[in-house]
């Protein structure tokens, strides 16, 4: 013990706590609500990866592990195909309903082209992530994903994911365009367009 530590220890040993502020109902061995919900480290505490009730809860783990990016037993190409189809399908609606041509007769086609353009931009970003230099970052196991896909985080796996994402994104946009173009939605489309242009 250094001289500073000794002097500090001696100076603080005379400190007395006021008895009215001491809570005797809490004992060191009690396991209360705070202990049950305490945040624990997953692996190395210096990394800052913590197991909280949110990221290590049953619902969160089941939801995240069933997404196509983390689901076990599928190829990187199919992961990209499924992820891209969801992106393309979901991007079509906002581009069609809130785009600059929403009140014209070309709204459906403009939404399709805008969604496909957004899928192309996202695909270009995925290609840049796999650009020469550093290999894609391999995610270590954590509190939410116990077994991340190892075949995805290689150059070939990421390239397969990217090509599947492009194909799925374009296909999802075209599928949404075909669904909106059906006859039974012709009566609903003017109502939806009037909601967005009411302001």
UniProtKB/Swiss-Prot annotation:
Topology in membrane: Multi-pass membrane protein
The principal location of this protein is membrane
Provide the protein's localization. Cellular thylakoid membrane
Gene Ontology biological process terms from the UniProt entry: photosynthesis
What InterPro entries does the annotation carry? PSI_PsaL (IPR003757), PSI_PsaL_sf (IPR036592), PSI_suXI (IPR022980)
Tagged with keyword Membrane: yes
Transmembrane helix as a keyword of this entry, yes or no, is yes
Instruction: Give UniProt keywords alphabetically.
Output: Membrane, Photosynthesis, Photosystem I, Thylakoid, Transmembrane, Transmembrane helix
The membrane-spanning stretches of this chain are: 108-128, 165-185
In the UniProt record, which is one GO cellular component term? plasma membrane-derived thylakoid membrane
The record's comment on protein family reads:
Belongs to the PsaL family.
Quote the protein name from its UniProt record: Photosystem I reaction center subunit XI
